[in-house]
């Protein structure tokens, strides 16, 4: 019976991921075919679809690398961070997951995210600021949250949408005017691929995997404080991966609002404290 429930849950999770992936790519397909049709009618629409297909193929192949490069992340070895590897191995074993690749971003802001096309190709990236800010229990909770995204099949639609947003907004570095048009399209791609509900689920599943909801709540408080002090500038590349992070890396104003996908901190803390048996 338990195996049947696990299988049903996995099928549902895969179906949900597929639906979010389709929703994420539709805006690009519509944009390319619409522009093509406006320029050259039916032939242009077909050409636009061909362009969209090429972009999707390239993005699918390199989406995780695009996301990691946006944060200047580099692979980290076990020699450099043996304790980080130990925690990830323990949590992966507890969650019956392959051990993900580990990366570090030089950002001083405390944050983290997971990318990949499936659990076997998953990677977790932590910022230098995260490792400097959290104690072991808090870091364990954050890593549990990221692994919950892996087990929940959230990675493929979220990572592909990050890659698509990076590709869509890249011309903005050359012509800021294009960003006025392409920025909302990239934001729509991201919003259709993720939901706040997935963050709540990752918080709960990650806290249970790590065994300490209070520690994850403490980590979120520190991360939010770090973001307030060291908010990143919402440039095109970073904006395209902001939805992957455990907390938004931006001040919630201006252009960054387009890419806001994270639930309110207060509600995340309330749910984690309820999970731990606390009452406010």
Which ranges hold each PLM region?
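Hydrophobic core segments of alpha-helical transmembrane domains in multi-pass membrane proteins
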Residues: 44-55, 178-184
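Hydrophobic core of alpha-helical transmembrane segments in multi-pass integral membrane proteins
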Residues: 27-34, 52-53
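Polar-ligand-bearing catalytic/cofactor-coordination segments
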Residues: 1-26, 46, 56-174, 186-280
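Short, hydrophobic transmembrane alpha-helix segments
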Residues: 33-44
């Amino acid at each position: 019976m338990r195996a049947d429930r696990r299988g049903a849950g996995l099928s549902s999770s895969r179906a949900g991921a597929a639906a979010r992936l389709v929703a994420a790519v539709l805006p690009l397909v519509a944009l390319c075919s619409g522009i093509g049709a406006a320029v050259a009618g039916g032939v242009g629409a077909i050409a636009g679809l061909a362009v969209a297909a090429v972009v999707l193929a390239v993005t699918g192949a390199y989406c995780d690398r695009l996301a990691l490069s946006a944060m200047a992340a580099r692979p980290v070895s076990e020699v450099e961070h043996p304790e980080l590897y130990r925690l990830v191995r323990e949590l992966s074993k507890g969650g019956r997951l392959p051990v993900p690749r580990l990366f570090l971003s030089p950002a001083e802001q405390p944050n983290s995210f997971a990318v990949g096309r499936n659990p076997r190709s998953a990677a977790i990236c932590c910022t230098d600021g995260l490792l400097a800010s959290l104690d072991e229990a808090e870091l364990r909770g954050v890593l549990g949250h990221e692994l919950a995204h892996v087990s929940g099949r959230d990675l493929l639609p979220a990572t592909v949408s990050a890659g698509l947003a990076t590709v869509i907004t890249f011309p903005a570095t050359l012509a800021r005017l294009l960003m006025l048009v392409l920025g909302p399209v990239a934001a729509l791609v991201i919003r259709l691929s993720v939901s706040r509900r997935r963050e709540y689920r990752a918080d709960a599943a990650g806290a249970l995997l790590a065994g300490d909801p209070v520690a994850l709540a403490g980590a979120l408080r520190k991360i939010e404080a770090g973001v307030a002090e060291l908010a990143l500038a919402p440039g095109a590349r970073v904006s395209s991966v902001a939805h992957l992070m455990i907390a938004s890396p931006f001040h919630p104003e201006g252009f960054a609002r387009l890419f806001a996908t994270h639930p309110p901190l207060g509600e995340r803390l309330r749910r984690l404290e309820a999970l731990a048996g606390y009452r406010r």
